[in-house]
From Swiss-Prot:
Its cofactor is FAD. It comes from Aster yellows witches'-broom phytoplasma (strain AYWB). FAD binds at G9, A10, G11, H12, A13, G14, V120, T175, Q365. This is tRNA uridine 5-carboxymethylaminomethyl modification enzyme MnmG. HAMAP family: MnmG_GidA. Belongs to the MnmG family. Its main location: cytoplasm. Keywords: Cytoplasm, FAD, Flavoprotein, NAD, tRNA processing.
Length: 618
């Protein structure tokens, strides 16, 4: 039997790929262990700055992460709620036992999708085109497309102190065949590192020495159509801090750390450093935050966010004894570092298909990213583009002004990765356009056009969009007269009086007024989220228009295509570094070329002149 597609790995990238492909194609999902499907080997949370927006983008395009998160969440918060809408994002603590179970049940009940427990040894490749896979037991399985989403399981090693063990997270076996084969073909393999903190028994913590961190009482969910009936009581988190005594212990044993003892080859994540890294790099700080987070409603176990380390086990005990609330904490699982093989993503097209091998796609942490959300959105896009390839249709590529997903993939392809890449709001030049609140308005039309959103969901979205447009129009035309009722209302809101009549749209631009003012005057039946959307579009109208204008400028550069057969060595006055980088990345547009490190504005001007002069010949 020949499958339309094989997905290797059932982590957060693999499940999104498989579910998208199974909507239209006969798909095989291969995993080393069905018990590890959608596992959460690091923090038991989904979302956060930029990442939370990505989860909503995944939902708008028909992915599963948002829905599963809503069902498994045990605490939810809106981050940066006091700041502007461009940086707001949801973050949820999720039950690490429930989440994988929810995903597994969905996979098992998905038509066109077969689950197989096994390990892939290598790929079947003929004439630079992937044809299927070979398992370590000798079985060969053919497929028209293959997506590799092996996460941190390629040639992975667990490190604690001076001990090394060949293993993936949670004791799942590592594999070497795929990375060895791709290296022999000519792929650039990079060695990366990440880590995880110790877990401790819930009932061994002295919570009186910590500060409780409750969730927010929100109506919002990650999924745009998640019913409110899924809500349940929230679990608290707790905050404590390291201190100078903690730091003395760490400095004393620094050479015993796997990282500082010289046992780690891989490069670690810049934005999620180990506790020993924090102590060394930020020596002026007297303390560092440690968040104590529940792992599950069904486990007597807490996760110590901020205490990632590769120190020996006895040192981990010593460190805990110095931290308020954790002096008598019993460790249930020791912290460790893990290093693994990944592939520099500049070897991929924007569709996430490899440049060297046709019909082979790579997605997730193996592309040099960190985080469940970054992995999931890559899996989604690889699944969509593998499906389009099977249908002989052009790839689906999101622009930087359309989605954080577009920012992430463009950064990976254009700049490559030498360290684990984390998505940040600061990476998006159009972040005011890429908000948490408008992910469906930006992307759901695409989801429907691609056949990923059903008619019922799309009709619900269309109704929402119509309601927003109606309220926007009414706000612009609704006159606020200077009368006693209106003046009294403004006084109650601590807002300045009116000297002359105005429109509701003009009034709502006052910083002290919000969507409640819209509800007060319009009296239209609509969800709070709809009123909030109208408020944002009115209040930030000028800034949004400016961002859209800048996006249009970028679009003009993106429309200037660079022919694939161009020879950069022939372009006089182009810097040597620019020639090397352009030849390596092979940008498809002038816009992409502007974002390549080592290519400056002078190089772009020279390239533009060359393209215009030699247009007919290329």
């Amino acid at each position: 039997m020949i499958y339309d597609s094989i997905v290797i790995g059932a982590g957060h990238a693999g499940i999104e790929s498989a579910l998208i492909l199974a909507k239209k194609h006969n798909t095989l999902l291969i995993t080393g262990s069905l018990k590890q499907v959608a596992s959460l080997p690091c923090n038991p949370s989904i979302g956060g700055p930029a990442k939370g927006v990505v989860v909503r983008e995944i939902d708008a395009l028909g992915g599963i992460m948002a829905k599963a998160t809503d069902l498994a969440q045990i605490q939810i918060k809106m981050l940066n709620s006091s700041k502007g809408p461009a940086v707001r994002a949801l973050r949820a603590q999720i039950d690490k036992l429930e989440y994988p179970q929810i995903i597994l049940e969905i996979l098992q009940n998905t038509p066109n999708l077969t689950l197989l427990e096994g390990l892939v040894n290598n790929l079947i490749i003929q004439k630079n085109q992937v044809q299927g896979v070979c398992l370590i037991d000798g079985r060969k399985i053919n497929a028209k497309t293959v997506i590799i989403t092996t996460g941190t399981y390629l040639a992975s090693q667990i490190l604690i102190g001076d001990t090394k063990k060949a293993s993936g997270p949670n004791g799942v076996p590592t594999t070497y065949g795929i990375s060895t084969q791709l290296k022999e073909i000519g792929f650039e393999v990079i060695r990366l590192k990440t880590g995880t903190p110790p877990r401790v028994k819930k009932n061994s913590i002295d919570y009186s020495q910590t500060k409780i961190q409750m969730g927010d009482n929100l109506e919002q969910t990650f999924g745009f159509l998640t019913p409110q009936t899924t809500k349940r009581p929230q679990e608290p988190c707790f905050l404590t801090h390291t201190n100078q005594t903690t730091h003395q212990v760490i400095r004393k044993h620094l050479n015993q750390s796997a990282m500082y003892g010289g046992y780690v080859e891989g490069i670690g994540p810049r934005y999620c450093p180990s506790i020993e890294d924090k102590v060394v790099r930020f020596c002026d700080k007297n303390s560092h935050q440690i968040f104590i987070e529940p792992e599950s409603l069904y486990l007597n176990e807490m996760y110590l966010q901020g205490l990632s380390t590769s120190m020996p086990q006895h040192v981990q005990h010593e460190i805990l004894k110095t931290i308020p609330g954790l002096q008598n904490a019993k460790i249930t699982k020791y912290a460790y570092a893990i290093e693994y093989d990944a592939f520099n993503p500049n070897q991929l097209k924007h569709s996430l298909e490899t440049k060297k091998i046709q019909n082979l796609f790579l997605a997730g942490q193996m592309n040099g990213t960190s985080g469940y959300e970054e992995a999931a959105c890559q899996g989604l896009m690889a699944g969509i583009n593998a499906s389009l390839k099977l249908q002989n249709k052009p790839p689906f590529v999101l622009k930087r002004n359309e989605a954080y997903i577009g920012v992430l993939i463009d950064d990976l392809i254009t700049k490559g990765a030498k360290e684990p890449y984390r998505l940040l709001t600061s990476r998006a030049e159009f972040r005011l356009l890429l908000r948490h609140d408008n992910a469906d308005l930006r992307l759901k039309d695409y989801g429907y056009q691609l056949g990923l959103i059903d008619k019922k969901d799309y009709n619900s979205f269309q109704n929402k969009k119509a309601k927003i447009n109606l309220l926007l129009e009414k706000s612009k035309n609704y006159e606020i007269l200077v009368n006693s009722d209106n003046l009294s209302y403004l006084k109650q809101q601590n807002s300045a009086s009116l000297g002359e009549k105005t429109t509701l749209a003009q009034l709502i631009k006052r910083p002290e007024l919000n969507f409640c003012t819209l509800q007060h005057f319009l009296q239209e039946k609509a969800d709070k989220t709809i009123y909030e959307q109208v408020e944002i579009q009115i209040k930030y109208e000028g800034y949004i228009a400016k961002a859209q204008k800048e996006a249009q400028k970028l679009a003009r550069l993106e429309q200037k295509k660079i022919p694939s057969k161009i020879n950069y060595a022939d372009i006089k006055n182009l810097s040597k570094e620019a020639k090397e980088k352009l030849d390596l990345i092979k940008p498809q547009t002038l816009g992409q070329a502007t974002r390549i490190l080592g290519v400056n504005q002078v190089d772009i001007s020279i390239l533009l002149v060359y393209l215009e002069k030699h247009h007919a010949l290329l």
